[in-house]
Amino acid sequence: MSISNVSAAKSAYRNALRATRIAFRQDVPVLSSARLQIKDGFTKNRELKDEAEISEAISKLNEVSKFLVQNIVQGEKQEDGKYFLNFHEKTELGDNETIRQGNKANLGSLAGAKVKKCSDN
Protein backbone atom coordinates (compact mmCIF):
# COMPACT_ATOMS: atom_id res chain seq x y z
CA MET A 1 0.00 0.00 0.00
CA SER A 2 1.39 3.39 -0.95
CA ILE A 3 2.07 6.07 1.63
CA SER A 4 -0.74 8.24 0.26
CA ASN A 5 -3.23 5.38 0.57
CA VAL A 6 -2.09 4.68 4.13
CA SER A 7 -2.74 8.27 5.18
CA ALA A 8 -6.01 8.37 3.21
CA ALA A 9 -7.17 5.16 4.90
CA LYS A 10 -6.32 6.47 8.37
CA SER A 11 -8.09 9.73 7.61
CA ALA A 12 -11.18 7.90 6.30
CA TYR A 13 -11.24 5.72 9.42
CA ARG A 14 -11.03 8.72 11.76
CA ASN A 15 -13.72 10.53 9.75
CA ALA A 16 -15.99 7.48 9.95
CA LEU A 17 -15.61 7.29 13.74
CA ARG A 18 -16.29 11.03 13.96
CA ALA A 19 -19.38 10.60 11.77
CA THR A 20 -20.76 7.90 14.07
CA ARG A 21 -20.27 10.20 17.05
CA ILE A 22 -22.23 12.96 15.30
CA ALA A 23 -25.02 10.70 14.01
CA PHE A 24 -25.51 8.56 17.13
CA ARG A 25 -24.31 10.79 19.95
CA GLN A 26 -27.32 10.16 22.19
CA ASP A 27 -27.72 6.44 21.49
CA VAL A 28 -24.79 4.60 23.08
CA PRO A 29 -25.76 1.04 21.99
CA VAL A 30 -26.14 2.10 18.34
CA LEU A 31 -22.97 4.21 18.52
CA SER A 32 -21.01 1.24 19.86
CA SER A 33 -22.42 -1.09 17.22
CA ALA A 34 -21.68 1.34 14.37
CA ARG A 35 -18.11 1.83 15.57
CA LEU A 36 -17.62 -1.92 15.85
CA GLN A 37 -18.86 -2.43 12.28
CA ILE A 38 -16.49 0.25 10.99
CA LYS A 39 -13.59 -1.29 12.88
CA ASP A 40 -14.42 -4.79 11.58
CA GLY A 41 -14.70 -3.55 7.99
CA PHE A 42 -11.46 -1.62 8.28
CA THR A 43 -9.65 -4.65 9.73
CA LYS A 44 -11.02 -6.92 7.00
CA ASN A 45 -9.82 -4.53 4.28
CA ARG A 46 -6.26 -4.51 5.64
CA GLU A 47 -5.69 -7.64 3.55
CA LEU A 48 -6.27 -5.75 0.28
CA LYS A 49 -3.19 -5.50 -1.95
CA ASP A 50 -4.53 -4.02 -5.19
CA GLU A 51 -4.25 -0.22 -5.21
CA ALA A 52 -7.56 0.14 -7.09
CA GLU A 53 -9.41 -1.97 -4.51
CA ILE A 54 -7.79 -0.01 -1.69
CA SER A 55 -8.83 3.30 -3.25
CA GLU A 56 -12.36 1.99 -3.77
CA ALA A 57 -12.61 0.85 -0.13
CA ILE A 58 -11.38 4.25 1.07
CA SER A 59 -13.88 6.00 -1.18
CA LYS A 60 -16.75 3.84 0.13
CA LEU A 61 -15.79 4.57 3.74
CA ASN A 62 -15.74 8.30 2.98
CA GLU A 63 -19.20 8.02 1.38
CA VAL A 64 -20.53 6.19 4.44
CA SER A 65 -19.15 8.94 6.68
CA LYS A 66 -20.77 11.64 4.57
CA PHE A 67 -24.10 9.78 4.55
CA LEU A 68 -24.08 9.30 8.33
CA VAL A 69 -23.39 12.97 9.00
CA GLN A 70 -25.80 14.43 6.45
CA ASN A 71 -28.71 11.99 6.43
CA ILE A 72 -29.08 10.26 9.80
CA VAL A 73 -31.18 12.06 12.40
CA GLN A 74 -31.93 10.63 15.82
CA GLY A 75 -35.44 11.03 17.19
CA GLU A 76 -36.75 10.95 20.74
CA LYS A 77 -40.32 10.04 21.64
CA GLN A 78 -41.86 12.73 23.83
CA GLU A 79 -44.45 12.20 26.55
CA ASP A 80 -47.22 13.39 24.24
CA GLY A 81 -46.37 10.61 21.76
CA LYS A 82 -44.72 12.91 19.23
CA TYR A 83 -41.11 12.58 18.18
CA PHE A 84 -38.47 15.29 18.59
CA LEU A 85 -35.81 15.09 15.87
CA ASN A 86 -32.28 16.02 16.86
CA PHE A 87 -31.06 17.91 13.79
CA HIS A 88 -27.52 19.28 13.82
CA GLU A 89 -25.70 21.87 11.72
CA LYS A 90 -24.47 19.29 9.18
CA THR A 91 -27.85 17.65 8.56
CA GLU A 92 -28.80 17.91 4.90
CA LEU A 93 -32.18 19.58 4.60
CA GLY A 94 -33.70 19.31 1.14
CA ASP A 95 -35.82 22.10 -0.25
CA ASN A 96 -38.16 19.77 -2.22
CA GLU A 97 -37.90 22.14 -5.18
CA THR A 98 -38.29 19.34 -7.74
CA ILE A 99 -41.50 18.20 -6.06
CA ARG A 100 -42.92 21.73 -6.02
CA GLN A 101 -42.21 22.10 -9.73
CA GLY A 102 -44.36 19.07 -10.45
CA ASN A 103 -41.55 17.52 -12.44
CA LYS A 104 -42.90 13.97 -12.59
CA ALA A 105 -40.12 12.84 -14.94
CA ASN A 106 -37.67 12.79 -12.03
CA LEU A 107 -40.00 10.80 -9.79
CA GLY A 108 -40.41 7.74 -12.01
CA SER A 109 -42.99 5.31 -10.65
CA LEU A 110 -43.41 7.46 -7.53
CA ALA A 111 -45.31 9.96 -9.67
CA GLY A 112 -48.16 7.49 -10.13
CA ALA A 113 -47.21 6.72 -13.71
CA LYS A 114 -47.88 3.28 -15.10
CA VAL A 115 -44.76 1.18 -15.11
CA LYS A 116 -44.25 -1.35 -17.87
CA LYS A 117 -43.74 -4.80 -16.40
CA CYS A 118 -41.90 -7.73 -17.94
CA SER A 119 -45.18 -9.65 -18.02
CA ASP A 120 -46.81 -6.92 -20.16
CA ASN A 121 -44.97 -8.09 -23.31
Swiss-Prot record:
Could you point out where the transit peptide sits in the sequence?
A: 1-26
Q: Where in the cell is it found?
A: Mitochondrion matrix
Under the heading CDD domains, the entry gives: Complex1_LYR_LYRM7 (cd20267)
Q: What is its main location?
A: mitochondrion
In alphabetical order, the GO MF annotations are: protein folding chaperone
Q: Which Pfam families match?
A: Complex1_LYR (PF05347)
Q: Which controlled-vocabulary keywords does the entry list?
A: Chaperone, Mitochondrion, Transit peptide
Listed GO CC annotations: mitochondrial matrix
InterPro entries referenced in this protein's UniProt entry, alphabetically? Complex1_LYR_dom, Complex1_LYR_LYRM7, MZM1/LYRM7
A GO biological-process term: mitochondrial respiratory chain complex III assembly
Identify this protein by name.
Answer: Mitochondrial zinc maintenance protein 1, mitochondrial
- Gene of this entry: MZM1
